[in-house]
């Protein structure tokens, strides 16, 4: 079958359509009942023989197996050495390693566990350095600063991407060309193609954990966020991708795009949850599911918008009273913003080893990013109150509004400027995830002419036809 025939074998569905959502759900049902669907990638058979192939398969199986929760420091060191040995063999052998890939799930499990162990080791090392209570472990960590080092992990991920030429293949798919023409000697092998592809998702995650949110989104330039993407075939990868993309958007103050990402995956999960129960990743997905609802609550409070009915109902059920407090704003909402952010944010890590000799100098990365986020919240704390007054007028004197709010006119002027600036957001339309158009993020706009505020409001009508069609489909 030619490349064009393979592409045309799948319907060309709109990214935002209900038909696509149904296709995603049906695809997930098939995955639950039949763990395959990658025959195009599995066409290469294993040429490896004897004990070498068996040993490599054993290493791959071990790499995809989670460490015990209470693993010792020596075990974590040994696990790092095993990963180094495995990836060195795959990347530096004379010619491609020939091995039959059991399934595309396997490659995700390897990359996912590799990054999880890196993340948990970094947090553990930082905790030991800050507490200063275990001198023996501190000494071991001090003597091995490069173990689970940030540079080593990034080097592995970038090397797998480069060796597989996966970005070139994905770019070719976007242009409608055959990716095999750009795959090269290594990228045509399922082993390298799968590891390279999921390494891109891994880079998104690592850069987000390090706090570089724009670079995190940049790594996905060649991946299309739709049902035809390979990550959508693995539920855990699908969920992880949308979580980190949505969170990166939120930290870049692109709340509309963050809500769109969170809503997409949460609707999908709500329609497939009966098929997930009993799966290995069900508990992790359920936890991330709750975290994303918390993040949507934060985004909606900072960027009021209409949500999908499914999301809105679930959000009111989970955070009804808390959501009202967030949307009301004011100093009383600050502790709630911080509580939800801490419970739902990634477990950030530091790119460098901590200072074991000066524990007081080490900062918890989660505290650092929470402080940055809370500074942004404080800047917009009075926006809901200001909006509630401005909605009542078409023109208003600055001093009069300052009197209502019991603040100085110049303080109010600064609030108005911040509010107006925050109402202009970049919104994705097409192209890379970092691209977009600057749009007005809410239905209320105003202009200052000396001390006179001119207010204009645009009310978007509810799309009742879509609402009726969606609910009729659910009933019948």
From Swiss-Prot:
Give residue ranges for domain PCI. Answer: 257-452
Broad class of where this protein is predominantly found: cytoplasm
Q: Name one GO molecular function term.
A: translation initiation factor activity
UniProt entry tagged with the keyword Protein biosynthesis: yes
Claim: Glycosyltransferase is one of the keywords in the record: no
Q: Which Pfam families match?
A: Paf67
Q: Name one GO cellular component term.
A: eukaryotic 43S preinitiation complex
List each coiled-coil range.
none
User: Which key words tag this protein in UniProt?
Assistant: Cytoplasm, Initiation factor, Protein biosynthesis
From the UniProt record, give one GO term of the biological process aspect: translational initiation
Cell compartments where the protein resides: Cytoplasm
**Could you describe the subunit structure of this protein?**
Component of the eukaryotic translation initiation factor 3 (eIF-3) complex.
**UniProt family annotation:** Belongs to the eIF-3 subunit L family.
Q: Which PANTHER family does the annotation name? A: EUKARYOTIC TRANSLATION INITIATION FACTOR 3 (PTHR13242), EUKARYOTIC TRANSLATION INITIATION FACTOR 3 SUBUNIT L (PTHR13242:SF0)
The UniProt entry, under HAMAP family, shows: eIF3l
The role this protein plays is: Component of the eukaryotic translation initiation factor 3 (eIF-3) complex, which is involved in protein synthesis of a specialized repertoire of mRNAs and, together with other initiation factors, stimulates binding of mRNA and methionyl-tRNAi to the 40S ribosome. The eIF-3 complex specifically targets and initiates translation of a subset of mRNAs involved in cell proliferation.
Q: What is this protein called?
A: Eukaryotic translation initiation factor 3 subunit L
């Amino acid at each position: 079958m030619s490349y064009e025939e393979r592409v045309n074998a799948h319907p060309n569905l709109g990214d935002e359509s209900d038909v696509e959502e149904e296709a995603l759900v049906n695809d997930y049902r098939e995955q639950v009942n039949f763990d395959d669907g990658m025959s195009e990638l599995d066409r290469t058979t294993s040429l490896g023989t004897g004990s070498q192939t068996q040993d490599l398969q054993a290493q791959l199986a071990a790499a995809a197996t989670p460490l015990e929760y209470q693993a010792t420091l020596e075990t974590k060191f040994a696990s790092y050495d095993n990963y180094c040995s495995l990836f060195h063999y795959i990347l530096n052998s004379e010619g491609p390693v020939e091995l039959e890939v059991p399934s595309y799930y396997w490659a995700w499990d390897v990359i996912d566990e590799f990054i999880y162990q890196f993340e948990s080791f970094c947090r553990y090392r930082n905790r030991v350095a800050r507490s200063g209570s275990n001198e023996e472990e501190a000494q071991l960590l001090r003597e091995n600063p490069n173990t689970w080092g940030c540079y080593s992990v990034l080097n592995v991920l970038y090397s797998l991407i480069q060796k597989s030429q996966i970005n070139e293949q994905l770019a070719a798919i976007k242009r409608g060309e055959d990716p095999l023409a750009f795959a090269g000697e290594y990228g045509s092998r399922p082993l390298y193609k799968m590891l390279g592809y999921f390494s891109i998702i891994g880079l998104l995650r690592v850069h987000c954990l390090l706090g570089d949110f724009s670079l995190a989104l940049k790594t996905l330039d060649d991946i299309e966020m739709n049902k035809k993407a390979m990550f959508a075939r693995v539920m855990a990868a699908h969920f992880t991708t949308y979580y980190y993309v949505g969170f990166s958007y939120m930290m870049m103050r692109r709340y509309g795009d963050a809500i769109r990402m969170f809503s997409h995956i949460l609707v999908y999960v709500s329609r497939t949850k009966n098929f997930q129960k009993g799966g290995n990743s069900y508990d992790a997905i359920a936890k991330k599911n709750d975290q994303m609802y918390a993040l949507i609550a934060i985004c909606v409070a900072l960027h009021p918008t209409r949500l999908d009915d499914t999301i809105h109902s679930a959000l009111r059920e989970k955070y009804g009273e808390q959501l009202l407090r967030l949307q009301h704003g004011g100093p009383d909402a600050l502790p709630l913003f911080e509580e939800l952010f801490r419970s739902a944010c990634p477990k950030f890590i530091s790119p460098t080893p901590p200072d074991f000799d000066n524990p007081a100098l080490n900062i918890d990365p989660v505290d650092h990013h929470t402080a940055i986020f809370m500074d942004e919240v404080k800047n917009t704390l009075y926006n809901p109150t200001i909006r509630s007054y401005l909605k009542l007028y078409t023109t208003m004197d600055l001093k009069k509004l300052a009197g209502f709010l019991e603040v100085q006119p110049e303080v109010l002027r600064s609030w108005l400027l911040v509010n107006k600036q925050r109402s202009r957001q970049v919104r994705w339309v097409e192209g890379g995830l970092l691209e977009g158009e600057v749009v007005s993020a809410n239905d209320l706009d105003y202009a200052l002419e000396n001390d006179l505020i001119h207010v204009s409001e645009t009310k978007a009508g509810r799309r009742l036809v879509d609402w009726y069609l969606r609910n009729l489909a659910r009933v019948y």
